[in-house]
Swiss-Prot record:
Function noted in UniProt: With S4 and S12 plays an important role in translational accuracy.
A Gene Ontology cellular-component term: small ribosomal subunit
Pfam family, one: Ribosomal_S5_C
Record's protein name: Small ribosomal subunit protein uS5
Protein family (similarity comment): Belongs to the universal ribosomal protein uS5 family.
GO molecular function, one term: structural constituent of ribosome
GO biological-process terms attached to the record: translation
Family matches, as InterPro entries: Ribosomal_Su5_D2-typ_SF, Ribosomal_uS5, Ribosomal_uS5_bac-type, Ribosomal_uS5_C, Ribosomal_uS5_N, Ribosomal_uS5_N_CS, Ribsml_uS5_D2-typ_fold_subgr
Subunit relationships: Part of the 30S ribosomal subunit. Contacts proteins S4 and S8.
S5 DRBM domain ranges (all copies): 12-75
HAMAP family cross-referenced by the UniProt entry: Ribosomal_uS5_B
Keywords: Ribonucleoprotein, Ribosomal protein, RNA-binding, rRNA-binding
Domain comment, as recorded: The N-terminal domain interacts with the head of the 30S subunit; the C-terminal domain interacts with the body and contacts protein S4. The interaction surface between S4 and S5 is involved in control of translational fidelity.
């Protein structure tokens, strides 16, 4: 079991999205701590994000990476792009992503780009609307990817075959 876990950790790409210094005001002054937002993925449809907080930056990053590994979800991709246009929302952030042709690259900003890179998406057009808070953008992006349906899933739900769905 330990070998399997060690092997699993090695295949995952890790990306640090944001580190932030936060403070707590107490009677004697301020207490500073750090937060870190990270994403991990295998480059083949598995992604997870984590948010860690600690007194020191390395400890916050370590906590965030552990949380990201614990909360991995699987996304079905279509040859390095998406199956269809999708929207995702979390609090004040709205993200829109649509499939792109081969060679387009990842057209996305900041936090959304990091999530798409570790997920294994190579060609996508995207736009973030509303709040650009990195935590909300990451959650909205993961939400959009998780709710994306493949043609085989849609066909199974409708009781048809994939060729009838594609037209």
């Amino acid at each position: 079991m330990a070998k399997l876990e060690a092997q699993q950790k090695d295949d995952l790409q890790e990306k640090l999205i944001a580190v932030n210094r936060v403070s707590k005001v107490v009677k004697g002054g301020r207490i500073f701590s750090f937060t870190a937002l990270t994403v991990v993925g295998d480059g083949n449809g598995k992604i997870g994000y984590g948010y860690g907080k600690a007194r020191e930056v390395p400890a916050a990053i370590q906590k965030a990476m552990e949380k990201a590994r614990r909360n991995i979800v699987t996304v079905e991709l279509n040859a390095g792009t998406l199956h269809h246009p999708v929207k995702g929302r979390h609090t004040g952030s709205l993200v829109y992503m649509q499939p792109a042709s081969q060679g387009t690259g990842i057209i996305a900003g900041g936090a959304m780009r990091a999530v798409l890179e570790v997920a294994g998406v190579h060609n996508v057009l995207s736009k973030a609307y509303g709040s650009t808070n990195p935590i909300n953008i990451v959650r909205a992006t993961v939400d959009a990817l998780v709710h994306m349906k493949s043609p085989s899933q849609i066909a199974a739900k409708r009781g048809l075959n994939v060729d009838e769905i594609r037209g």
